[in-house]
A protein has these predicted regions:
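Non-heme Fe(II) oxygenase metal-center motifs and adjacent flexible, charged/small-residue loops
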Residues: 1-311
């Protein structure tokens, strides 16, 4: 028989924070249905939220969470046409060179060949950066590694910020690609030099449960529904709030995105224009690409986050 080891003190159990408890509550479970009764719904229940004191009106179609000062939710603020344009650009252009993605970052780190150029997002694509590219190793924004921010993205951010009376210079952006079962753990966006500057976040595709807490994970977060066309703006102290996405709900994408026939400029089968220029202009290049996008959006979510770096 082997030598018996001396008994050791049991390892300390990791602390379960209030934020972690909320994440566990909303993440998919197989046996018990998820209770969404506490999720704040500002698309259909804004008036009730105002009456209950959960939010206050902060501008045309904008609401500030009462217990999360500086966080504004703008439900349904992005029009369907603008959603279509953004969705197609995220799907077909923003992950292509010279964009930085999790795949190009891994290839550079490991010294392997860069990923092949593809029309649709690869299945293992998780994020892509625009404008000033983010260095994930050093947690800094490169001054010498930047591309012009797409004009329609910058203009959208200007319009959204104007609704709550703030301004920003859109310098850097990240597109997050959520597929069924994907989540985003609680985190703080703290790489920017000046975190008093606004951060704009736009949701496209399937609905999500969004959690926003406080300056530590010990603060119990508020759960908010985010649907396609909703925007959030983080300002002031809200830039230091922990936030995350514990749940994406497949098959909740609105018809104006998921149905090819809902696209007003859907091309004929002879179009065949798959150029970057067509994607960047927001024009569906051809029937095949449009079908691919609609199929992707039926079960997925796109999240565009834009910020001013401030240095």
């Amino acid at each position: 028989m082997g030598r018996r080891r001396k008994s050791q003190a049991p390892a300390e159990t990791p602390q379960i924070t209030a934020f972690r408890e909320a994440e566990k509550r909303y993440r998919p479970r197989t046996r018990t249905p998820t209770d969404y009764s506490d999720v704040l719904d500002l698309r259909d229940g804004a008036a009730a939220g105002v009456a209950a004191g959960a939010v206050r009106r902060a501008g045309p179609g904008a609401y500030e969470l009462t217990d999360r000062p500086g966080l504004f939710v703008l439900p349904g603020v992005v029009a369907p046409d603008a959603q279509r344009r953004l969705a197609f650009c995220c799907y077909g252009a923003y992950h292509r060179p010279p964009a930085e993605t999790n795949l190009t970052w891994l290839a550079r780190r490991d010294g392997t060949a860069p990923p092949p150029r593809t029309a649709a997002p690869p299945a293992n694509l998780r994020w892509a950066t625009l404008g000033r590219h983010y260095n994930w190793t050093e947690r800094t924004y490169a001054c010498d590694h930047a591309e012009p921010m797409p004009r329609h993205v910058a203009e959208l951010c200007d319009d959204l910020c104007g609704l709550i009376g703030v301004t920003m210079n859109a310098e850097a952006a990240i597109v997050n690609y959520y597929r069924p079962g994907d989540t985003m753990g609680g985190h703080v966006d703290d790489a920017e030099t000046d975190r008093s500057l606004p951060l704009v976040s736009v949701s496209l595709g399937c609905s999500a449960v969004f959690l926003v807490g406080g300056a530590t994970r010990d603060v119990a977060p508020t759960a908010v529904w985010l649907r396609s066309g909703d925007a959030c703006i983080f300002t002031g102290e809200a830039r230091s709030y922990y936030h995350g996405v514990p749940r994406i709900l497949p098959d909740t994408c609105p018809p104006h995105l998921r149905e090819a026939t809902a696209w007003p400029d859907a091309p004929g089968p002879s179009n065949g224009d798959n150029s970057d220029e067509a994607y960047a202009a927001g024009r569906p290049p051809d029937d095949e690409a449009l079908r691919g996008l609609c199929e992707f959006l039926r079960g997925s979510r796109l999240n565009l986050n834009v910020r001013e770096v401030g240095d």
